[in-house]
Design a protein with these regions (language model features):
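Positively charged n-region of N-terminal signal peptides that target proteins for export
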Residues: 1-5
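Aromatic- and Gly/Pro-enriched helix-to-coil junctions and flexible linker segments
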Residues: 20-137
C-alpha cells in the first residue's frame, strides 16, 4: 500500500511540474506580445548594446533602433526585423554572431555577443510581433 501512495504522489508531482512549466512558457510568450515587454526587457538591451551607434542622432549603417518603423525599414542592408519571423530578422543574425567569421557586422562590434538570455528576449519580442509602445523612444 505504501508503494502505491508513494507512486501516486510522485505521479501527481510530475503532472503539477509539467503544468507549471507549460504555464510559465505560455506566460513568457504572452508577455512578449505586450508593449510593456519592450519597455521593461528589450529597450534596456538596446540601450546598453545598440543605442550608442544606432539610436538618437547616430544611425550607423543607416539603422535607427528608436522606433518600430525604423527597425522595419532597417539600414543599408535592409530591414532589421521581420515581426513574427525571427529567422528572417537580420538583427538576430548579427547579435547571434552567425554571419561569416570575417563579417565585421557582428553586433555589438568588437565585443562579445550578447548573453543567451538577452538574445532570447529579443527573439521572443520579434516572434510576438515586435511591439513598441507609441510613446517609447
Amino acid at each position: 500500500m505504501r508503494s502505491v501512495v508513494v507512486g501516486f504522489t510522485g505521479f501527481c508531482t510530475l503532472v503539477l511540474l509539467t503544468i507549471g512549466l507549460n504555464t510559465t512558457s505560455v506566460q513568457a510568450r504572452e508577455d512578449a506580445s505586450k508593449p510593456e515587454f519592450y519597455t521593461a526587457r528589450v529597450k534596456p538591451i538596446f540601450d546598453t548594446n545598440c543605442a550608442r551607434c544606432h539610436g538618437g542622432i547616430n544611425h550607423r549603417g543607416g539603422l535607427n533602433i528608436d522606433t518600430r518603423e525604423s527597425l522595419l525599414k532597417g539600414g543599408h542592408t535592409g530591414p532589421a526585423i521581420v515581426p513574427g519571423d525571427p529567422s528572417k530578422s537580420l538583427l538576430l543574425t548579427l547579435i547571434r554572431h552567425e554571419g561569416p567569421a570575417n563579417d565585421p557586422k557582428n553586433m555589438p562590434p568588437n565585443k562579445s555577443k550578447l548573453s543567451d538570455a538577452d538574445i532570447q528576449t529579443v527573439t521572443d519580442w520579434i516572434k510576438a510581433g515586435a511591439i513598441i509602445p507609441a510613446a517609447s523612444k
